């Protein structure tokens, strides 16, 4: 059995956590996030800690409590520090630039790709082959990074494509005659 739910979430200074029935709101210096907590979980907020207790008689209550604890911890980290995903474009002619709230990508297709950034995610391009995505919601930042990577995933023969900064692409040997 996982024991994630047994550890409380510590709320740092400058972050405010409020609970209204099953809706939990976390406010911090970078913004605010709201999430509805499952009914199988009781949430208790006391002395800068958020505790998650399973409801008796519900079969998967411990699992739901562990999930809620992990999600709320990500919310607290997001509004206090934020989340960052870095992408690299590897390939001849692969470029990225920012136009307002859009990301213009040239990835070897016959047409340029325009990716609209959702609210809460900001992008910057330190160079034409680097993209830095940042935001308060870990799920949204990761989803946007995965969508951009999905346009041209790294291929195993030459390693061309869009990859995460810390991603290691397993290379294959070319076919021998």
UniProtKB/Swiss-Prot annotation:
This is Large ribosomal subunit protein uL6. It comes from the Bacteria. This protein binds to the 23S rRNA, and is important in its secondary structure. It is located near the subunit interface in the base of the L7/L12 stalk, and near the tRNA binding site of the peptidyltransferase center. Part of the 50S ribosomal subunit. InterPro entries: Ribosomal_uL6-like, Ribosomal_uL6-like_a/b-dom_sf, Ribosomal_uL6_a/b-dom, Ribosomal_uL6_bac-type, Ribosomal_uL6_CS. One of its GO terms (molecular function) is structural constituent of ribosome. One of its GO terms (biological process) is cytoplasmic translation. Keywords: Ribonucleoprotein, Ribosomal protein, RNA-binding, rRNA-binding. Gene3D superfamilies: Ribosomal protein L6, alpha-beta domain. It comes from Shewanella frigidimarina (strain NCIMB 400). Pfam families: Ribosomal_L6. HAMAP family: Ribosomal_uL6_B. Belongs to the universal ribosomal protein uL6 family. One of its GO terms (cellular component) is cytosolic large ribosomal subunit.
